[in-house]
């Protein structure tokens, strides 16, 4: 094929983008404004005047709300405005002119504010010139906070600073008017009081009514006032000021009909309304020229726009009419009903104004009814809660049917249709397990695969294969449709009219075909390239070259600038004068006179067959137009016919074999074949709810004959899926770019490690763990036959078990395709042709292989496989202080060297979610593909081994032995005795209360702890006494299911049931159940169950167990909604954050939120160690040493070992090289150095003497740590490589990942607060409620706790006991100082004393209690009296000082208090009030700190001599008042913490608040065992505080975080409020965020959208010129390998028969000719070879 005919490859002399943007025009920003009446009239197509829907059904009434000029709502007919059908016409707006103006329903509060700050006489904002200097910043920077401050100051003005008129304040009034209150408001109030006092004087009532009526501001007056506001006052009204120097000559259209108002005035029936209307008309006619002129920008908000004089009528397609089933009529949309009511009441209002005979009150009532109907149309409700007036004919007025109601909420347009959309090419069905599939594969039912298609573009390399698919048709594998694009272009006579002759000019047609084929979008043919410059240039070039056939040249730049590049109407000479037939703006240069008599139209219509060409009258003309979707369109200019030559999409479902053969023969490159979903195609697999990014991942398809989606159960964890009826979704991507990105970014093997905590999210589960655990046991041996059989289970060489036997039904090419993938980087199956079989572990008396050897073969794979696993770690049951290691009796210490499993049983710790996992090691060192391969092998072998070995659970497995029952009795008896002892102490009063708790609370907490320990002890018995073959014990030990507690509940005892963290409450008439006595504290009466599931439960035990289960079910049901809303708020606030190329975290406005992600910029996925070091240096060094030693032994080399000094010197030399110093920072170098000095070098000192006496190779086997120069070099290289990859990549959406990392585990947290054992019996709010408090930024939290650290001087020589005693003494003292003490706590008595002379209250202090509290000398009578006199509430009763005589001190322990008043009527009431108030008066401590509890904790003390942890004490203070606590002497303020975030921010600053948020979220997660990386939590804290104050993730905080993102705020909550505020403030949305990009359909600026990918040109090395891109010599396409020779032959045939119809051959003929050519070529090559062979024969000597 010639170079200019290769249409697939993009060529250019300069670097070009790899992907050509199909939509070069994008929405860059959105400007919001309130549409004025003038702009609305310009946009309107028709004036709606009649409320009648149909003149003659089904013909809509002219000028009605269903007028056809508004567009179409059904599929029949054409639009009367644009002439298009329903698919192409987007609808047109109309208008309704109101008889009287109304307030805008969404802006009525803003109108009220404007009228309050604008003087009604001079229309100036009531802010003086001097005060305006303070707000001068509004002229160049608009600030809503400054605007509100200025408005508040304007409302306080008594007189207008410009005209000195009295000031007014507008408030709500009845109906839709505004009540203006002036300075005579007090007089009106007095008149009203006089009226009531004189039994409703009629004259005064009328006078009052007249006074109040004169000051009611209706929309007419408001419009008059706001129209005269100068532009310099706009910023104070909340409207940004803009330069308005260019004015139009038009007058303002925002006025009422003056004729109607004049007629109303002449009739004189409504005096008030007439006077108002006439005054408005007179003043309106006298408005200055400046106020009547409009700006050139029609979409700038003005103050008078808050008053409506015209309302828009939406297009008919937005409010379609539904035909009734019987055909008798239609059911109209709610918007249509609202519009009809508005027109009806509008006509009635006009009649009332014209006639003049209607009373004024009725006119006002109709006016209010018009306001109500307009409000229902806009916002679906009536402001102020006013009920609408229902007519007799109305069936009822429904709320929630307005325009705003269609936008807001979950079912609104923003959330239901714009942010999330329903898609095609998707499927959904039930899921089922298949352990023989790779973790990258999902089995798709054949029925689904036949319905899902992919648009495959035909090329010279896949044409043969696609022809075979076309021949199959609907038979799988086949195709459903074919788009013969080339025939549409080649044989279209319209191209001939442009001078493109098929037989004469092939080059020009090739250009046209290349041009249009680039524009066609393969997955949506209705969306073509918009205004491509090269398309316009190509059309100009084609037209200019064919000037003989066309008289004029079309130039895109000659079109008017404001005219769209698309003429929507059909130009008809017979109807040239009608505006409804042609756009008046069509330029004459668009008309191209053609000489031919038959005209055609080339358009686009996907999914329909081509229409025939219709011959037209010779007098018709054709207009060539460029439409907005950049297709080549020839519009027929005849009024009689309108024919279109559409894209030829042919369906194969109804074609027979002959028809499909014809279509296959006509297939050419650039055609599109919609083929079936084939094996190995890329899919997206999803399960809802999608709580994190791993809920939707990329899989490869495998086709099977079943009806479910099948996949490997190891991938269940990220989906949180099980196989009890769950359904999942698939999405079949339709673009090559999307498939490529999904494979790299969303592949399931790429998501083995979760970004939430950096641990494995995908691993072996349940039966797989059980099978591997049993197989790796010490007692598993097998013969060579069994050994090879198990190896073959995992090392599947042919893929039969993986892909299914039914795959052979699809032909050998698919099998060949699968085989060709083996060994490639994308091969996640990991076929093994030649496994690495090892020698038997037992040779005599019989050769036997162990199960560990089978696992070793699975880990090794092929001989050429470079995967070497080196792990050494203890299991969870291995004691950390043990030194037995490989000699552990329980076989729970794992050693794997060079992929040889030597010691230990594999459990969940090494096969699932852990950083000690085998798969985690593989991902970090060898990549995710190797981990996926080995995971599949383990899953296959575990499933087959378990089937052969047998693993069942029966009743005998949970049957306790007599020994176990005996030990149970002993443990239960001991627990009962301890409980009874505590109960007796409680009943006798000997039980002491824990500080901060009552005696009863202390008893319940103690008993709960004692009885819970009983079950724990029984669980330990189960682990020790059960046989090692016990099935529940095996499942518990390997981690597949269950725990020791579950085993104890099945076999031994259920134990204490928990109800919200405590025992069962006595909420059934002072007892838990009717089976027990009232107030019983016995264990069984409080939910302790002595029986097990094996023995069965007693009735009261069954009730307790069911009650505890119900408590958990309710908690789970309630937390679902709370956590779902919590995650939605988190995602909305964090979705815009991403990592920039300077490694800062920025939002969509490019504001810096963090200078480094998580303060260090590291990716949690690549961090191997949680804290301190970034990598597991021990494992890395051991791995390198083992690899080098095995390599040395294989090569026969002798390593030179280093002693300590040589190793240290070598390390210093290597670290100082530039190779390591450029990338590795000083912190990492110091970690490596300290690691060597502490862990490696001491061992070298003690072991290197062996190397002097033994051969080095033998010494290497004995030494515990061997080290060579190569080892150190390789180790540093690996550290450097890992460190370079450690940073989070630029473009990463770190915000969304952080939100999901916190939101997803919150679904597993509890809703209730519980007793925290480590916090000294204080009930701390935890779980979801605490998390909501933190992220919401709540000011008043439920349990504010301040952790007060004490400052104690400790000498180095002091003993631990002395240090502990000092801390305890200091804690008691500080507790008494800080904790608030009330008068009632230290009073012996508070007595009322009545005598003839005086009545008072006598208070006696209990000095013993004061001394016991340690407050002797701090609390005295004088301090108590001073506290009473300084109390705000007591001041009103006893005065402010002692001189008043209300307080008298009688002794050191007694004083009296009496009220100031001596009135008989008030004295008794004041005495009782004072008696209730006195006990609650604080007399010592901090009043806001209700209590302080001493907390004990362990810590290493540097000042003490002992190295053991010391017992220390601190205070937990409940309440607020951090600043007051820090002022107390003796407090260590550097370590004192508070969980009240807002208080910390106000006291210590915003950075302290950031640290507090991070610590609190971390503590909340850790208390529930939820692992979340600290970097995500820090990002949450920074986004809450990066504005300088704490902003919660609420609708209010989000508004302050992203005030300019109108679309995002509207899609979250309060849709109408945000849209109205944005329109009034002329806000500009830059539309750079994620939500805005999704709604507007443009790429977001993160991920792959954060950069542009360029393709460099190819240069000839000799000439230096650019050359065409050449594909690879061999191309794999679903198993069909095409060599270069075949490509050249196909290209030769295509070149010879591509354009010439006479030489066109069918597929069979072309194949025959190809075979003949091959035979001739073989003959020629054979003859040449024979001649050459003859020439090479040796001559005779």
From Swiss-Prot:
Q: Nucleus: is it a keyword of this entry?
A: yes
Q: What is its EC number?
A: 2.7.7.6
Keywords from the UniProt entry: DNA-directed RNA polymerase, Magnesium, Metal-binding, Nucleotidyltransferase, Nucleus, Transcription, Transferase, Zinc
Q: Pfam families attached here? A: RNA_pol_Rpb1_1 (PF04997), RNA_pol_Rpb1_2 (PF00623), RNA_pol_Rpb1_3 (PF04983), RNA_pol_Rpb1_4 (PF05000), RNA_pol_Rpb1_5 (PF04998)
Q: Where found in the cell? A: Nucleus
Gene Ontology terms describing biological process: DNA-templated transcription
Region (Bridging helix) residue spans: 1099-1111
Query: What quaternary structure, including any partners, is listed in this protein's UniProt entry?
Result: Component of the RNA polymerase III (Pol III) complex consisting of 17 subunits.
| Entry similarity comment | Belongs to the RNA polymerase beta' chain family.
- Which named protein is this? DNA-directed RNA polymerase III subunit RPC1
Gene source species: Giardia intestinalis (Giardia lamblia)
Classification of source organism: Eukaryota, Metamonada, Diplomonadida, Hexamitidae, Giardiinae
Gene name of the encoded protein: RPOA3
């Amino acid at each position: 094929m010639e170079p200019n005919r290769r249409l697939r490859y993009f060529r250019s002399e300069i670097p070009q983008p790899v992907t050509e943007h199909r939509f070069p025009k994008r929405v860059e920003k959105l400007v919001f404004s309130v549409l004025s009446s003038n702009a609305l009239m310009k946009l309107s197509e028709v004036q709606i005047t009649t409320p009648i829907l149909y003149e003659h059904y089904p013909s809509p009434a002219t000028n009605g709300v269903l007028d056809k000029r508004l567009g179409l709502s059904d599929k029949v007919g054409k639009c009367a405005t644009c002439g298009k059908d329903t698919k192409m016409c987007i609808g047109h707006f109309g208008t309704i002119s109101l008889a009287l103006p109304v307030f805008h329903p969404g802006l009525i509060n803003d109108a009220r504010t404007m009228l309050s700050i604008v003087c009604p006489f001079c229309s100036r904002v009531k802010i003086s010139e001097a005060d305006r200097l303070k707000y001068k910043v509004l002229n160049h920077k608009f600030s809503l906070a400054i605007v509100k401050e200025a408005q508040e100051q304007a409302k306080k003005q008594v007189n207008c600073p410009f005209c000195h008129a009295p000031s007014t304040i507008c408030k709500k009034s009845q109906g839709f008017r505004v009540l203006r209150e002036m300075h005579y408001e007090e007089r009106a109030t007095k008149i009203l009081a006089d009226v009531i006092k004189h039994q409703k004087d009629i004259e005064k009532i009328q006078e009052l009514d007249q006074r109040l009526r004169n000051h009611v501001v209706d929309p007419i007056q408001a419009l008059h006032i706001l129209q005269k506001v100068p532009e310099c006052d706009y910023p104070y009204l909340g409207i940004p000021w803009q330069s308005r120097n260019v004015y139009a000559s038009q007058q303002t259209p925002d006025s009422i009909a003056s004729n109607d108002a004049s007629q109303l005035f002449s009739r004189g029936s409504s005096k008030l309304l007439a006077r108002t209307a006439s005054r408005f008309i007179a003043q309106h006619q006298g408005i200055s020229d400046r106020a009547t002129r409009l700006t050139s920008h029609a979409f700038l908000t003005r103050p008078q726009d808050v008053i409506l004089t015209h309302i828009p009528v939406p297009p008919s397609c937005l409010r379609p009419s539904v035909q009734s089933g019987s055909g008798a009529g239609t059911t109209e949309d709610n918007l249509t009903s609202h519009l009809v009511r508005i027109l009806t009441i509008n006509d009635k209002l006009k009649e009332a104004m014209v006639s003049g005979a209607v009373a004024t009150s009725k006119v006002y009532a109709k006016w209010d009814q018009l306001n109500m109907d307009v409000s229902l149309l806009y916002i679906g409700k009536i402001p102020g809660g006013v009920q609408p007036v229902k007519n007799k004919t109305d069936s009822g007025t429904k709320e929630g049917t307005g325009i705003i109601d269609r936008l807001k909420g979950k079912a609104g347009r923003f959330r239901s249709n714009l942010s999330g959309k329903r898609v095609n090419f998707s499927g959904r069905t039930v899921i089922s397990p298949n352990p023989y599939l790779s973790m990258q594969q999902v089995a798709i039912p054949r029925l689904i695969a036949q319905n899902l298609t992919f648009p495959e573009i035909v090329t010279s390399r896949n044409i043969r294969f696609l022809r075979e698919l076309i021949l199959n048709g609907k038979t799988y594998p086949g195709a459903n449709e074919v788009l013969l694009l080339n025939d549409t272009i080649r044989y279209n006579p319209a191209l001939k009219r442009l001078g493109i002759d098929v037989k004469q000019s092939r080059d020009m047609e090739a250009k046209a075909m290349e041009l249009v084929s680039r524009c066609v979008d393969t997955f949506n043919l209705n969306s073509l390239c918009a205004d491509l410059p090269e398309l316009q240039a190509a059309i100009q070039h084609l037209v200019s070259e064919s000037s003989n056939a066309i008289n004029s040249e079309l130039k895109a730049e000659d079109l008017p600038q404001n005219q769209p590049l698309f003429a929507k109407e059909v130009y008809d000479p017979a109807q040239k004068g009608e505006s409804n037939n042609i756009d008046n703006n069509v330029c004459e240069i668009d008309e191209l006179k053609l000489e031919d008599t038959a005209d055609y139209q080339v358009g686009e219509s996907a999914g329909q067959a081509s229409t025939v060409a219709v011959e037209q009258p010779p007098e018709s003309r054709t207009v060539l137009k460029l439409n907005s979707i950049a297709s080549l369109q020839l519009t027929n200019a005849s009024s009689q016919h309108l024919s279109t030559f559409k894209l030829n999409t042919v369906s194969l479902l109804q074609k027979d074999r002959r028809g499909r053969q014809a279509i296959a023969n006509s297939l050419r490159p650039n055609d599109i074949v919609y083929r079936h979903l084939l094996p190995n195609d890329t899919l997206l697999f999803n399960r809802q709810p999608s709580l994190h990014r791993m809920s939707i991942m990329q899989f490869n398809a495998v086709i099977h004959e079943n009806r479910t989606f099948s996949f490997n159960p190891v991938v269940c964890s990220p989906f949180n899926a099980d196989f009890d009826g769950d359904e999942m979704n698939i999405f079949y991507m339709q673009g090559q770019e999307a498939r490529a990105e999904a494979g790299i970014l969303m592949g399931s093997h790429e998501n083995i490690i979760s970004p939430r905590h950096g641990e494995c999210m995908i691993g072996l589960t349940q039966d797989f763990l059980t099978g591997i655990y049993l197989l790796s046991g010490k007692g598993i041996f097998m013969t060579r036959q069994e050994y090879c059989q198990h190896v073959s289970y995992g090392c599947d060489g042919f893929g039969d078990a993986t892909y299914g036997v039914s795959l052979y039904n699809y032909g050998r090419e698919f099998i060949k395709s699968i085989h060709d993938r083996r060994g490639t980087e994308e091969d996640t199956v990991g076929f093994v042709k030649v496994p690495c079989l090892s020698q038997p572990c037992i040779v005599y008396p019989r050769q036997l292989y162990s199960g560990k050897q089978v696992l070793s073969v699975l880990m090794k794979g092929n001989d050429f496989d470079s995967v070497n696993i080196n792990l050494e770690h203890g299991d969870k049951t291995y004691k950390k202080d043990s030194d037995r290691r490989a000699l552990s009796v329980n076989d729970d210490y794992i050693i794997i060297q060079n992929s040889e499993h030597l010691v230990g049983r594999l459990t969940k710790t090494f096969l699932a979610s852990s950083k000690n996992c085998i798969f985690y090691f593989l991902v970090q060192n060898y990549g995710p593909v190797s981990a996926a391969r080995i995971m599949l092998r383990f899953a296959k072998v575990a499933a087959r081994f378990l089937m052969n070995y047998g693993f069942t659970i029966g009743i005998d497995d949970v049957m306790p032995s007599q020994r176990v029952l005996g030990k149970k009795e002993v443990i239960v008896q001991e627990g009962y005795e301890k409980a009874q002892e505590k109960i007796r102490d409680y009943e006798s009063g000997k039980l002491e209360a824990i500080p901060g708790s009552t005696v009863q609370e202390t008893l319940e907490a103690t008993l709960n702890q004692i009885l819970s320990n009983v079950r724990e002890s029984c669980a330990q018995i189960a682990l020790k006494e059960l046989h090692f073959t016990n099935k529940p014990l095996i499942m518990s030990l390997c981690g597949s299911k269950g725990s020791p507690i579950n085993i104890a509940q099945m076999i031994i005892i259920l134990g204490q049931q928990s109800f919200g963290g405590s025992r069962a409450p006595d909420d059934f008439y002072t007892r838990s159940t009717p089976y027990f006595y009232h107030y019983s504290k016995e264990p069984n009466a409080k939910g302790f169950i002595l029986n097990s599931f094996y023995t069965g439960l007693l009735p009261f035990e069954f009730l307790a167990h069911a009650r505890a289960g119900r408590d958990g079910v309710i908690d789970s049901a309630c937390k679902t909604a709370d956590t779902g809303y919590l995650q939605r708020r988190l995602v909305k606030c964090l979705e815009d954050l991403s990592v920039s190329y300077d490694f800062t975290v920025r939002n969509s406005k490019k504001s810096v939120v963090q200078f480094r992600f998580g303060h260090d910029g590291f990716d949690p996925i690549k961090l191997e160690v949680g804290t301190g070091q970034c990598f597991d240096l021990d494992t890395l060094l051991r791995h390198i040493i083992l690899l080098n030693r095995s390599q040395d032994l294989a090569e026969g080399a002798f390593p030179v070992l280093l002693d300590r000094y040589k190793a240290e010197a070598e390390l210093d030399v290597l670290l100082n090289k530039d190779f390591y110093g450029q990338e590795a920072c000083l912190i990492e170098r110091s970690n490596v150095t300290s690691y060597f000095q502490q862990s490696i070098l001491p061992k070298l000192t003690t072991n290197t003497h062996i190397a002097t006496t033994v051969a080095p190779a033998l010494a290497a086997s004995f030494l515990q740590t061997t080290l060579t120069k190569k080892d150190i070099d390789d180790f540093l290289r690996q550290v450097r490589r890992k460190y370079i990859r450690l940073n989070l990549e630029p473009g990463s959406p770190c915000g969304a990942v952080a939100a999901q990392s916190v939101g997803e585990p919150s679904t597993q947290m509890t809703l209730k607060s519980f007793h925290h054992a480590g916090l000294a019996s204080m009930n701390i709010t935890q779980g979801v409620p605490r998390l909501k408090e933190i992220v919401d930024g709540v000011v008043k939290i439920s349990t504010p706790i301040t952790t007060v650290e004490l400052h104690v001087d400790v000498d180095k020589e002091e003993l631990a006991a002395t240090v502990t005693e000092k801390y305890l003494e200091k804690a008691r003292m500080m507790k008494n100082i800080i904790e608030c003490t009330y008068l009632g706590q230290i009073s012996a008595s508070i007595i009322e004393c009545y005598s003839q002379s005086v009545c008072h209250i006598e208070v006696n202090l209990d000095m013993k209690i004061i001394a016991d509290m340690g407050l002797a000398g701090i609390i005295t009578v004088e301090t108590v009296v001073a506290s009473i006199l300084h109390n705000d509430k007591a001041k009103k009763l006893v005065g402010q000082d002692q001189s008043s005589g209300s307080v008298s001190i009688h002794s050191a322990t007694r004083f009296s208090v009496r009220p100031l008043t001596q009135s008989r009527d008030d004295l008794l009431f004041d005495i009782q009030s004072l008696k209730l108030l006195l006990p609650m008066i604080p007399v010592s401590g901090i009043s806001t700190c209700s209590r302080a509890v001493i907390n004990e904790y362990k810590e290493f003390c540097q000042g003490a001599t002992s190295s053991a942890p010391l017992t220390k004490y601190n205070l937990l203070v409940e309440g607020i008042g951090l600043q007051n606590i820090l002022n107390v002497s003796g407090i260590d303020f550097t370590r004192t913490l508070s969980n009240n975030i807002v208080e910390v921010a106000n006291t210590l600053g915003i950075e302290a608040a950031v640290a507090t948020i991070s610590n609190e979220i971390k503590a909340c997660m850790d208390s529930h065992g939820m692992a979340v990386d600290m970097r995500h939590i820090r990002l949450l804290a920074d986004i809450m505080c990066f504005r300088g104050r704490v902003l919660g993730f609420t609708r209010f905080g989000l508004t302050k975080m992203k005030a300019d993102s109108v679309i995002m705020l509207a899609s979250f909550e309060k849709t109408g409020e945000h849209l109205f505020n944005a329109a009034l403030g002329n806000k500009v949305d830059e539309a750079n965020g994620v939500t805005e990009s999704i709604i507007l359909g443009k790429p977001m600026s993160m991920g792959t959208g954060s950069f542009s990918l360029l393709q460099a040109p190819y240069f000839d090395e000799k000439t230096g010129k650019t050359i065409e891109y050449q594909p690879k010599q061999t191309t794999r396409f679903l198993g069909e390998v095409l060599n270069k020779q075949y490509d050249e032959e196909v290209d030769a045939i295509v070149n010879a028969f591509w354009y010439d119809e006479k030489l066109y051959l069918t597929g069979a003929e072309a194949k025959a000719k190809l075979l003949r050519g091959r035979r001739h070529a073989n003959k020629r090559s054979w003859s040449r070879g024979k001649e050459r062979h003859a020439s090479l024969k040796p001559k005779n000597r």
